[in-house]
């Protein structure tokens, strides 16, 4: 289940996600 702020690193790994605390790729990998 992907949360509302779920953003794959393929789109923009530099985009700070409020849910991941600004670390998108770190949580997915």
UniProtKB/Swiss-Prot annotation:
**InterPro entries xref list:** PsaD
GO CC annotations, alphabetized: chloroplast thylakoid membrane; photosystem I reaction center
Protein's cellular compartments: Plastid, Chloroplast thylakoid membrane
Q: Does the keyword Thylakoid apply?
A: yes
Q: Name one GO biological process term.
A: photosynthesis
Annotated region described as Disordered, given as residue ranges: 1-29
Q: What membrane topology does the UniProt entry give? A: Peripheral membrane protein
Q: Which UniProt keywords apply?
A: Chloroplast, Membrane, Photosynthesis, Photosystem I, Plastid, Thylakoid
Q: What is its biological role?
A: PsaD can form complexes with ferredoxin and ferredoxin-oxidoreductase in photosystem I (PS I) reaction center. PSAD may encode the ferredoxin-docking protein.
Recorded family membership:
Belongs to the PsaD family.
How is this protein named in the record? Photosystem I reaction center subunit II
Q: What is the lineage of its organism?
A: Eukaryota, Viridiplantae, Streptophyta, Embryophyta, Tracheophyta
- Gene behind this protein: psaD
């Amino acid at each position: 289940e992907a949360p509302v702020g779920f953003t794959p690193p393929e789109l923009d790994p530099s985009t700070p996600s409020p849910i991941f605390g600004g670390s998108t790729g770190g949580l997915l990998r």
